[in-house]
Amino acid sequence: MGERDDGLGLSLSLGNSQQKEPSLRLNLMPLTTSSSSSSFQHMHNQNNNSHPQKIHNISWTHLFQSSGIKRTTAERNSDAGSFLRGFNVNRAQSSVAVVDLEEEAAVVSSPNSAVSSLSGNKRDLAVARGGDENEAERASCSRGGGSGGSDDEDGGNGDGSRKKLRLSKDQALVLEETFKEHSTLNPKQKLALAKQLNLRARQVEVWFQNRRARTKLKQTEVDCEYLKRCCDNLTEENRRLQKEVSELRALKLSPHLYMHMTPPTTLTMCPSCERVSSSAATVTAAPSTTTTPTVVGRPSPQRLTPWTAISLQQKSGR
């Protein structure tokens, strides 16, 4: 066994002194392609000089070995180069930077689209606010008879603070009496009543609107209660009729029970009615007994039998 250092790397050679065979060298250090090729040429020249008779047989072996050595050395060199150079961190960052630049270019190239999107968002917000304001106006109209009435009740300040109309007892009494006479007022009546009560015409109109709404609501509640009572009565009557129908069906299925049943209705009369009915019966019975004459001495007609008719015919023939 021998060791040799050519200056290109540490190499080990295994050989046998007795048998003159080509030695197998193991390269333990990463070598460059030029060093490996030079070492391979040196080894090949040495083997050719020492053993010229076995060139043909050994050439194939050296070719396979050289190809394997070249592959392994190339892989090692690539790994070593990557290790020495380090990891390329800027590769992914460059791709991300390219994507960011493309996005910025797209935004810069289409300013009209950005402006249109912003204007569309503002338009949507304006529409939503307008819808909310319309709903609030409808709610105020349904509660107090319209926004105009609320402004008039506030005193025309327009500050948005709603104040309930306060009426004195005399004003409320006059309004109630007028409402009993006329549930609706024409413009002349409205102005006259407002001047009489020291109110505005719009306030009088709103009061009448609210009073009509309350009256209608009360009337609806009364009608609902009446209909509810009618529905309860009809339900009870229907239940009773269903019970009678079921009883009649049971009687129809069992006819032998008719004899044992009591009459469905029994009539009772008061004593005075019984005396009147008994006296009327006696009065009608007395003339019938007096007016029937009895005939004495006249034989009652008798019915002839067929045998008597035959005997009479025989007697007349003799």
From Swiss-Prot:
Region: Disordered, residue numbers: 1-23, 128-165
Record flagged with keyword Plastid: no
Any one GO BP annotation for this protein: regulation of DNA-templated transcription
Localisation: Nucleus
One term under GO cellular component: plasmodesma
SMART domains: HALZ, HOX
Keywords: DNA-binding, Homeobox, Nucleus, Transcription, Transcription regulation
Compositionally biased tracts (Low complexity): 8-17
Disulphide bridges: none
Region (Leucine-zipper), start-end ranges: 227-248
Residue ranges the UniProt entry marks as DNA-binding: 160-219
Primary localisation category: nucleus
Induction (UniProt): By transition from light to far-red light.
Biased composition (Basic and acidic residues): 128-140
A Pfam family annotated for this UniProt entry: Homeodomain
GO molecular function: DNA-binding transcription factor activity; DNA-binding transcription factor activity, RNA polymerase II-specific; sequence-specific DNA binding
The family this protein is said to belong to: Belongs to the HD-ZIP homeobox family. Class II subfamily.
Protein purpose: Probable transcription factor.
Stated name of the protein: Homeobox-leucine zipper protein ATHB-4
Gene name for this UniProt entry: ATHB-4
